[in-house]
């Protein structure tokens, strides 16, 4: 349903943001 889709999108965005922050903090960016 709609809420399930929104939840999945939010989870994906949060995961991306966290990965980006980790990358910047550790300097271990992976492309």
From Swiss-Prot:
It is found in: Secreted. One of its GO terms (cellular component) is extracellular region. Its main location: secreted. Expressed by the skin glands. Pfam families: Antimicrobial_2. Disulfide bonds join 23-29. Antimicrobial activity against Gram-negative bacterium E.coli. Belongs to the frog skin active peptide (FSAP) family. Ranatuerin subfamily. This is Ranatuerin-2PL.
